[in-house]
């Protein structure tokens, strides 16, 4: 934290002069220093100037560095382009990370990500592998004909968490066809309306 405070001071003193110098320092920072920088990047003056550093962190193979950027961090949702944000969300899923720790999922959800989620789910199903139910959250407002079939499959699944995830997607969707899928799932709808079932409580027993 002390280092972040120092960076704030020097950047406020002369942002144009110190920004490239700090970027160079970050390139040679050790893992712990880089994690701290990424976690508190949003607190720096003109944080957009360090976007290249944040984007570069998406490519790291060090999970703690990646998680410092992806988890409970407002920076990606505020400054990443869709392709970069999608990459972060998908990599978290591929690494079997905690998708619920990513901020502003509903705000940053987009059509391309929804399509990729469906395609990836089909690959996992074909291989007989499970999918984190939270993975479906970004498709909520992009449920097309293909995703309608995915939602129906999840609602008919023997996995209770998949039922709940699909119910949340369909209930909050702007697509009438998605809402229609819930006509025979009154208990799930009631749980959502009573605020017993939310994305935050999805995995609670």
Please give the residue ranges for each predicted region.
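Alpha-helical scaffold domains
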Residues: 1-205
